[in-house]
Amino acid sequence: MINITLPDGSRREFENPVSVMEVAQSIGAGLAKATIAGAVDGVLVDASDVIDHDASLRIITAKDEEGVEIIRHSCAHLVGHAVKQLYPDVKMVIGPVIAEGFYYDIYSERPFTPDDMAAIEKRMGELIAQDYDVIKKMTPRAEVIEIFKARGEDYKLRLIEDMSEDIQAMGMYYHQEYVDMCRGPHVPNTRFLKAFKLTRISGAYWRGDAQNEQLQRIYGTAWADKKQLEAYIKRIEEAEMRDHRRIGKQQDLFHLQEEAPGLVFWHPKGWALWQVVEQYMRKVYRNSGYGEVRCPQILDVSLWKKSGHWDNYQDNMFFTESEKRTYAVKPMNCPGHIQVFNQGLHSYRDLPIRYGEFGSCHRNEPSGALHGILRVRGFTQDDGHVFCTENQIESEVTAFHQQALAVYQHFGFDEIQIKIALRPESRLGDDATWDKAEGALRSALTACGVEWQELPGEGAFYGPKIEYHLKDAIGRTWQLGTMQVDFMMPGRLGAEYVDENSQKKHPVMLHRAIVGSMERFLGILIEHHAGQFPAWLAPTQVVVANITDAQADYVSGVTKTLAEQGFRVSSDLRNEKIGYKIREHTLQRVPYLLVIGDREKENGAVAVRTRSGEDLGSMSLQAFIERLHAEGA
């Protein structure tokens, strides 16, 4: 007798071993039709898998997160089925699930085109309409090898070679004549795969190594139903409209080019935006007791060996040589700040000592990981380091937390999640030190009265960190600020202070950043605001435009007055119709356009229009200036 315990605590008895689907059928035809897979004693299995012992069972449907993941994984196999029907000579590689979708890597003698993608998507739809069952067969390893040899699937054979010899049987999933190996589970029938869409094609390399052969990667997305798919497509379209690369080009903010991969060319308007953020953060430094410093871009590798970066981070560093000495271009600012601290003696009465730097760093990110200004090789951080005693950790972290929240809210971010990244496998120091560091962060957040999520294994090699994850206007989450507790690096680099007993001790070092990479933060700001920055932040706050040449001198005077007041303003004196000027500057998302005609010139006034098209009417220049000040500009 087999006893199956369901999530509500009820039990069902079966005389013989029973499949997940058979249990679902015993509950009801509707549930059986909706069944995708099962979780037996917490382990995901196929609907066809047989339970031969007393167990707990949760039926997985498309309403479950796991169900949607299974749908996506099965859609990847469906890509394989369609591709092999259309292009029999290609070689299938691997097709995993990723966030909100899936991809399949394929070796093809020629690159796939958009027309190919459309044909593949069409064939997938035709296969789904056939409403066929997906059949799972556990198959001996030797037989699997013979199956893929007969089909010429060289990459599948390589993947089998990589598997442990302990694996002597594999799940083979049959989509009619097409077969793929997988741990599973997969959907029992193609009717679950109707809400899918192929999204793009890109290049990839076998095993992610650029020295290996290039593959074609087909990306797609799949959901529980058409409604979810349509909502996703709408969200992606909105994200494309907000893409910082697109807006950066439209508004002439920056550009990137092949000769400098991962490095940004800032144009005047983009640099104006940068300066607004930098000066704002500089004020935060000053108000929080940070002394701003500036440290060298390159340092001898001996320092990076002492700091631990050489052993733990050198693959991400750039190096250069001069006069038979090897130098590293700094990937982080912390070792430099310790050198500043080490100049002179410090008493416990001097602590905490806080240094801040808009430090330019370089990291050798893989070219495939680069993405606009969100993922770059050269970047500037609002980097700060606090040298303090153990007893001061909680108060410093608490103060930073309150400060970070205030900054995020000022930039328009109200939904903030807090996480603690805990010790990684590759790390400095012993467990007792890590226990102390992680405990200090938990205590500080408890004192702040906030909830947090913990991320095992995601801390830096020298210490755990608090992470601030911000939700943007379309619901995407971005990781920005960090606060890290470091008991390691001060000792490795000889940082000391004299305690109340006249003994030399190593300070605790707190690594903190609020916006993190300036480049990345600006990219996020562009997308969050869709280029429509609040007046205080906009690279150009006001454009003053004349209707005819008769107002040119007055326009120049208004522009000069606003510039002298510290506003970012430009004039448009071109011989164009005013309607054309209004449209152009509205598309540039300039917050305010001042239109000057004869009436405004005679009355010493300005006619004010907003980028949304609202006509605020005529007002004195002083009244307009007061309006800007009221908006924080």
Curated annotation (Swiss-Prot):
Molecular function as annotated in GO: ATP binding; metal ion binding; threonine-tRNA ligase activity; tRNA binding
Residues holding Zn(2+): 334, 385, 511
Domain named TGS: residues: 1-61
CDD domains with a match to the protein in the record: TGS_ThrRS, ThrRS_anticodon, ThrRS_core
GO cellular component, as recorded: cytosol
Free-text comment on the cofactor: Binds 1 zinc ion per subunit.
Keywords, in A-Z order: Aminoacyl-tRNA synthetase, ATP-binding, Cytoplasm, Ligase, Metal-binding, Nucleotide-binding, Protein biosynthesis, RNA-binding, tRNA-binding, Zinc
Main location: cytoplasm
Subcellular location per the Swiss-Prot or TrEMBL entry: Cytoplasm
Catalytic activity: tRNA(Thr) + L-threonine + ATP = L-threonyl-tRNA(Thr) + AMP + diphosphate + H(+)
Cofactors, names only: Zn(2+)
Region (Catalytic): 243-534
PROSITE patterns hit by this protein: AA_TRNA_LIGASE_II, TGS
Gene3D superfamilies: 3.10.20.30, 3.30.54.20, Anticodon-binding domain, Bira Bifunctional Protein, Domain 2, Threonyl-trna Synthetase, Chain A, domain 2
InterPro entries, per database record: aa-tRNA-synt_IIb, aa-tRNA-synth_II, aa-tRNA-synth_II/BPL/LPL, Anticodon-bd, Anticodon-bd_dom_sf, Beta-grasp_dom_sf, TGS, TGS-like
UniProt EC number: 6.1.1.3
Highest taxon listed in the record's lineage: Bacteria
Statement: the UniProt record of this protein carries the keyword Metal-binding: yes
Function comment: Catalyzes the attachment of threonine to tRNA(Thr) in a two-step reaction: L-threonine is first activated by ATP to form Thr-AMP and then transferred to the acceptor end of tRNA(Thr). Also edits incorrectly charged L-seryl-tRNA(Thr).
PANTHER family reported in the protein's UniProt record: THREONINE--TRNA LIGASE, CHLOROPLASTIC_MITOCHONDRIAL 2, THREONINE-TRNA LIGASE
Protein name, UniProt field: Threonine--tRNA ligase
Record gene name: thrS
